[in-house]
C-alpha cells in the first residue's frame, strides 16, 4: 500500500509499505476513504530535524472496515466508520470520565504502537472504542461535501465541540471563542448547536470571522 512519511522539515514522501495486519484481537483493519492534514502535522512539517528514520503521518480518517480481530464486537467488515484522532478502549476509568486521550490502554497514531493514518489502509487498535459507525451512508456514492463534513468529525470539529462541552455551553449561555482558526470556528458551530444565546468570536482574519458569523457567532471582536 501507499503511505505518507515525514523525513524532516518540508520533506514528505509517499512510499510503498506492507499492508497492515491484525496484531491484537481488539484490532481492526480499515480501508481509507478520506484522510487529511492537521495543524499539528504542519508543526512537524516546518520544524522536524532531518532524519533517516521517518515519522508516519496522519491521525484523521474516515474509512471502511475490512477485517476485525476476534474480540471486536461493535464494528464489522463493510461498516463505514470515523476514526477519532486517538485510539482508546472507551471503558477504562479515564474514558468513562470523558478523558479518552488519557485512556489506560490507548495511544496516538504515528507512533511505534500505531502507524499514521495517511495511508491506503490502517490498523486501528482498540477498535470497539476507537471507531464510530456512520449508519446509512455509502461512501462510494456519498456527496463530496458530506464526506468532508464527516472527516471533520475525526479531529478538528471534535476539538471545538469538546471545548464547548467542557465549558458547559448550553441553552441561554454567553460564551467567548478566542481565535478564528479551524478549532475556534468549530467551537462557534458547536456552541450554536448546544444552544448558546450569545457567541462572541474574537479574531483577526475578516474572511474567517465572516464565516464564524455564518456559523452562529452573534458578535465579532476584531483585533
Which residues does each predicted region cover?
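Adenosine-nucleotide cofactor-binding segment
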Residues: 174-180, 192-223
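Glycine-rich beta-strand-centered segment in the early N-terminal region that forms part
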Residues: 18-35, 48-93, 115, 135-140
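Cytochrome P450 core scaffold surrounding the K-helix E-X-X-R motif
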Residues: 40-45
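NAD(P)H dinucleotide-binding glycine-rich loop of Rossmann-like/cofactor-binding domains
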Residues: 91-178
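Short glycine/threonine/proline-enriched tight-turn/helix- or strand-capping micro-motif at secondary-structure
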Residues: 11-19
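Nucleotide donor/acceptor-binding cores
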Residues: 1, 26, 172-173, 197
Amino acid at each position: 500500500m501507499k503511505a505518507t512519511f515525514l523525513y524532516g522539515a518540508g520533506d514528505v514522501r509517499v512510499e510503498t509499505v506492507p499492508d497492515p495486519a491484525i496484531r491484537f484481537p481488539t484490532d481492526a483493519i480499515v480501508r481509507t476513504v478520506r484522510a487529511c492534514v492537521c495543524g499539528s502535522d504542519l508543526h512537524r512539517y516546518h520544524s522536524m530535524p532531518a532524519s533517516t528514520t521517518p515519522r508516519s503521518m496522519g491521525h484523521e480518517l474516515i474509512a471502511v472496515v475490512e477485517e476485525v480481530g476476534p474480540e471486536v464486537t461493535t464494528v464489522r467488515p463493510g461498516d463505514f466508520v470515523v476514526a477519532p484522532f486517538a485510539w482508546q478502549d472507551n471503558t477504562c476509568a479515564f474514558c468513562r470520565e470523558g478523558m479518552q486521550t488519557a485512556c489506560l490502554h490507548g495511544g496516538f497514531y504515528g507512533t511505534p504502537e500505531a502507524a499514521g493514518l495517511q495511508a491506503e489502509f490502517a490498523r486501528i487498535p482498540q477498535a470497539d472504542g476507537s471507531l464510530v459507525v456512520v449508519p446509512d451512508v455509502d461512501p462510494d456514492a456519498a456527496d463530496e461535501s458530506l464526506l468532508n463534513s464527516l472527516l471533520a468529525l475525526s479531529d478538528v470539529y471534535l476539538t471545538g465541540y469538546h471545548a464547548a462541552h467542557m465549558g458547559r455551553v448550553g441553552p441561554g449561555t454567553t460564551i467567548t471563542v478566542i481565535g478564528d482558526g479551524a478549532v475556534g470556528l468549530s467551537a462557534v458551530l458547536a456552541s450554536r448547536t448546544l444552544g448558546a444565546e450569545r457567541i462572541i468570536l474574537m479574531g483577526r482574519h475578516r474572511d474567517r470571522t465572516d464565516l464564524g458569523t455564518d456559523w452562529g457567532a452573534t458578535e465579532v471582536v476584531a483585533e
